[in-house]
Amino acid sequence: MQIWHMEPFPCGDRRLPHHVFPPKKITTTQLGQLAGVQYYKVDLDDTASMKKRLSAVKTEKNVTFTDMFTVSETMLEFDDKMEQFYEPQVQKEDVISLVVEGTCYYDVEPEDDSWIRVQVEKGDLIVIPKGLSHRFTTTPQNFVKIQRFFSRKVEGNQG
């Protein structure tokens, strides 16, 4: 996982890093303090360790339902979906995502017009707290497979 402050008004391709200049990286601890976002590294190759970590998160967050969500250029209406995912949104429950394959960005907005970009990759589990404005996009590779966790079954494919 890599985390940095984004430029205030990013222009051009949203899938690029959009660092402020000079780059201002932050740690997972700082991300937690600034935005309440939690981060866990999950070893997907160690089944016992993975199950233990996921079980703890599921219990702590009252998870009762999971699904797999894949974003790739081959999906129907890819460009429209990416526009939709990049629109800032605020959820009524925590957004819990484990990257199973690929890489993507979650942008979080702890203060008005102050975005922090979080690049997550295989094995990264991120918990964005309910009520925090956030958005989602891919990297230029246009591929990510995410396991999502919910406290109830949801309909449709939200980002």
From Swiss-Prot:
Keywords: Cytoplasm, Nucleus. Its main location: cytoplasm. InterPro entries: ARD, ARD_euk, RmlC-like_jellyroll, RmlC_Cupin_sf. It comes from the Eukaryota. One of its GO terms (biological process) is methionine metabolic process. The keyword Cytoplasm applies. One of its GO terms (cellular component) is nucleus. GO terms for molecular function: acireductone dioxygenase [iron(II)-requiring] activity. Coiled coil: none annotated. It is found in: Cytoplasm; Nucleus. Transmembrane segments: none annotated. Belongs to the acireductone dioxygenase (ARD) family. Probable inactive acireductone dioxygenase. This is Probable inactive acireductone dioxygenase 1.
